[in-house]
Amino acid sequence: MSKDKFLLHEEFKNPLNKAEFLEAKKLYLEFITKNEYEIKATKDIFQLIQNIKRSPEKIGPYQIMSVFEALNRIGSDLVLLSGAEKLFTSEIPPEKILLRMGNTQGFDFEVFYKGDKVIYGEAFNAAESFCKHKMRQAIDKLVDKNPDEKATSAIIFINEEMKGILEKYKNKKEKQSQMVIHTIYCKTN
């Protein structure tokens, strides 16, 4: 995400330890709670589409992008923040985590453990109608494009509303792979 569109680029550009993460998360959430953007009321559906999907705005930590795009990124970012916090408070917390906020390419996050062990992960915040498709994409990417050919595990962060739908979901690629994919369901509010 370019720094001209994501206002917290500097805070998230490097792997963060727990203290750095908590500070960056606090700052991110301040951008959300102090947001001044308001959806412009209109009964004209064509104008509403223009306002939401086309007009560049500043919303939360994003600027110069449509409200639609910014809200999609914020939704995924909230999953990333919640998932990272769960990892930092887990039984085996990582040393650092690199979060790619508003990511559009590469892996969404990397988890760094002692001994140079890196676990790659994907994150998404999806609606019920799209969650299995997003899960399939995430699994395929983690299995097929993992830069560590010897990787035995990966992580997927998902908005917790999809737990009932995805709890028992396994796709063909995951079943055939030697990789264990850990799913972490995340609060987004």
Model-derived regions, located:
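Hydrophobic, Leu/Ile/Phe/Ala-enriched alpha-helical segments that form helix-helix packing faces
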Residues: 28, 32-35, 83-91, 142-146, ...
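Conserved catalytic cores of phosphodiester-cleaving nucleases, focusing on short active-site segments
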Residues: 109-129
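C-terminal tail/extension regions appended to the core domain(s) of diverse proteins
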Residues: 1-10, 175-189
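Short beta-strand or tight-loop elements
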Residues: 105-107
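Nuclease-adjacent, charged terminal/linker segments that flank catalytic cores
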Residues: 1-55
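Acidic-basic catalytic patches of nuclease active cores, encompassing PD-(D/E)XK
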Residues: 53-100
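Catalytic cores of nucleic-acid endonucleases
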Residues: 123-178
